[in-house]
């Protein structure tokens, strides 16, 4: 039996297979979630995993979960992250999930979702913002973090991605160091995530999921902003599909 978790995010889609096979991969979601689902189905079949077989159980989550028309079950990201948080940190914890489109703060109490908070529609406090700014600076996301770790923060005050990008362009025009601009960019996102999280009474155990959990620098900065330890998760980008699959 294969247990398959599929997380169709706004920018990336993630797949984890456990059971008879041990597979995981990430691919761009692209403009069509349905086409992405077909790509996932075809790729799994290349690895001898037939999602339509009685020997496969598929659970879908994420922004485009309804497009996974071959899923046996569909659950929200809130539910699957709460399940995973309980497994990792116990019945009392908070999960900060920084995705491409949104950021979620999920409080777990007694092993159940107690409350959650999401950012507004602007992408300024999300991974997409960092991706846009990294492209503007001509570096990868990992290189952005590496540069930020060596820089001094230049303030980026705008709450809007478009206006924030204008601030970055102005800094570039002034000849400011890329390391300092990168530090300002990461600091800006950490500020917005922390402000969102501090709207809730966070428990002692806080874990970070999503692609940014792979960055020790971002985890460190966010911990400083919150005044408490934020623990990264291994393979943070895969948490949604790992925690949604059954059993």
Spans of model-derived segments:
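Short beta-strand-loop/turn "lid" adjacent to the catalytic site in phosphate-handling enzymes
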Residues: 21-29, 49-79, 114
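Short glycine-rich, Thr/Ser-proximal phosphate-binding strand/loop in the N-terminal lobe
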Residues: 3-39, 43, 113-123
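Conserved phosphate-binding catalytic cores of ATP/NTP-utilizing and phosphoryl-transfer enzymes
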Residues: 64-115, 194, 198, 242-246
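Adenine-nucleotide phosphate-binding core of ATP-dependent small-molecule kinases
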Residues: 164-199
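Short glycine-aspartate micro-motif
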Residues: 3-7, 57-59, 93-97
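Glycine-rich phosphate-binding loops at beta-strand->alpha-helix junctions
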Residues: 63-64, 202-225, 233-240
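Glycine-rich phosphate-binding/hydrolytic loop that grips phosphoryl groups
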Residues: 127-131, 231-247
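Glycine-rich phosphate-binding loop plus the immediately following alpha-helix
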Residues: 110-156, 160, 246
